[in-house]
Amino acid sequence: MSTVSEQPTRRAQVPTDRGRRTQAAIDAAARTVIARKGILATTIADIAAEAGRSTASFYNYYDSKEAMVREWAVRFRDEANQRVLTVLRHGLSDRERAQQAASAHWHTYRNRLAEMISVSQLAMINGDFAQYWAEICAIPTSFITEMVRRAQAQGYCAGDDPELIATAIVAMFNQFCYLQLAGPAPGPAGAPDDQTCIDTLANIFYRALYYREVHPR
């Protein structure tokens, strides 16, 4: 089984400026359609129509929509790893680290919405993409697990499994981001802004780790 850390098989490098512009147009169109319909309902004809290109043009760059998403997954992994560095830097308080973790997850999801939707949906039907999704989720799960262990060293989350807590928090992050960024259209009040969403995630995350039970007298 291939993994996201392996470079996927791809066609020869696009040789001309025109070719690069065409591929960029196809990628942009695919992201637009996938964000709207999801990867499973998206066809190559949909992507070509959105890009204003022929279906044959798509196959000059990708063998299939799955091959396109594999290339995206590699690019996404590199960006996600860079965002993690903001959370791991020294000198942050526990509250600041929770805020940075929420911000990194939100902005990664917003900036790579089509990738997140594509890989998560294909993971339900394809073993390779299930592995890709597991690797993508492992990035935040790993550093949140370490945050839980640090909280336990301070007397919080006693008796809990750090990795299970981290897995639950990442699942919550993913579902929240999906619903806010790709879910049903917002009501009359409109969708919450970025900072409100980040603060909501950070508050839930921080309170989940740094709570103290109050026992009734």
Descriptions of predicted regions:
Residues 111-143, 163-164, 191:
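Short secondary-structure transition hinges
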Residues 25, 33-67, 71:
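Helix-turn-helix
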Residues 99, 103, 138-149, 163-166, ...:
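An amphipathic alpha-helix signature
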Residues 87-91, 116-123, 180-184:
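Secondary-structure edge/capping motif, primarily at the C-terminal ends of alpha-helices
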Residues 18-31, 47-48, 72-80, 84, ...:
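Generic hydrophobic, amphipathic alpha-helix propensity
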Residues 71, 82-114, 165-169, 198:
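Hydrophobic alpha-helical connector segments
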Residues 1-21, 185, 213-217:
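N-terminal intrinsically disordered/low-complexity leader segments
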Residues 130, 152-202, 212-217:
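Hydrophobic/aromatic-rich alpha-helical bundle segments in the mid-to-C-terminal region
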